[in-house]
Amino acid sequence: MIYPATRGLWLRLFLPFAAGYFLSYLYRTANAVIGPVLAHELSLGDNALGLLTSTYFLAFGAAQLPLGMLLDRFGPRRVEAALLVIAASGAAVFALSDALGGLALGRALIGLGVSACLMASFKAFAQWFPPERQASLTGWIMAAGGLGALAAAKPLELALGFASWRTIALGLAAATLAVAAIIWFVAPDKESEEKGTGIFAQLAGVKAIYSSRHFWRYAPMGFWFTGGFMAVQGLWASRWMAVLEGMDGAAIALRLTWMSGAMLAGFLFMGFFATALVHRGIKLEKIYLGAMLVAVGLLSLICTLPNFAGGLLWPLLGICFSLSNVSYSLVAQAFPPALSGRANTALNLLVFAGAFGLQWGIGGLVGALQAAGWTSDAAFRAAFVTLLGGQLLALGWMFLSRRRG
């Protein structure tokens, strides 16, 4: 396969998809800052807030399997542009809602609408760039998401001082429509290898992925680590800081900004150096496993000593989270380019099942323990220790499957 690599292609391909993923990540993490405002204005408890926030992940995850087939059949440009229109409508519904049901519907439409932003980028990169550049490209596109996470922290908190959350949501709806138009009219297209392939043939490809031992080596890690980090970053980190560290909204927003900045640094590291590391014979899987081991250590310290160096531990956890996304490249490299969309969305399904289940589950466990008489501090610690236990089990499975080959 010939891979053109002109500067014009880079600008026309990367920048539109990067803008989409920027918005996707901003939407994903915005509730960490907006959540307390919603809880106060609409009298939402932790359980309701967790459900509201996790509807994004539920809709996002449910879209992944059909999304993989759509990407492989119709291409990333058409699929992402169309879905972003749905995301814009969801932001508008969210902005105009006064009850939990309407807010949840809006978040679900947003989740469905941005469900292709990362996977469409991966598919486009697989079509236009050679395999040895995929890890670096993953780093660059994740850096765009890191910028979105940064925007959803202190800048969003400052914006709430000048405009209501409803006005901000309507502004995001307009920005999302603009990005959809840019992708539709600017991003290049390439004839899909799967065009004309029947639904049963496409499903056979999905079956091959889910039957692969290589895929299941990484699937539990995606659920507990990448999904778990999303659940924590998107909502429960801010609640932990408020309940166990006694931080106010401004301090939490600043901490989240540092955490997002650390994530961005990790993404940029992969963007700059991943291809060079591969050329030097350094296995990305070793970097991935090392980062996840460090993440377990950091979360253990946070759970055990919540008031010890949180300003350092949380940003370091952000760096580890950024490196967890290497798993997408590690999974996809075992499958041909024609299956790249389905391979990445198969893993992403597990990731977002984890994000939804764990985000809602943490809220449900905290609420149940508090109802049973536990203090808020003890309930949150128990929920985070449960997450830590799942991550340790996933690591154990990973090492066991590596030994078996």
Regions found by a protein language model. Give the residues of each.
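Juxtamembrane intracellular "pre-TM" segments in multi-pass secondary transporters
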Residues: I2-T6, P188-A219
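Helix-breaking motifs and short loop linkers at transmembrane-helix boundaries and internal kinks
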Residues: S43, G75, L96-G102, G113, ...
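Extracytoplasmic gate region of multi-pass secondary transporters
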Residues: N31-A32, R213-M270, L358-G363
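Helix-loop-helix hairpin linking two adjacent transmembrane segments in secondary transporters
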Residues: W140-A187
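Paired small-residue
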Residues: I86, G90, G101-L109, A309-L316
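Extracytoplasmic
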Residues: R12-D46, L67, V232-S238, L358-I362
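Conserved MFS/SLC helix-loop-helix module at the cytosolic interface between two early adjacent transmembrane helices
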Residues: A62-G101
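Cytoplasmic helix-loop-helix junction between adjacent transmembrane helices
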Residues: G106-A144
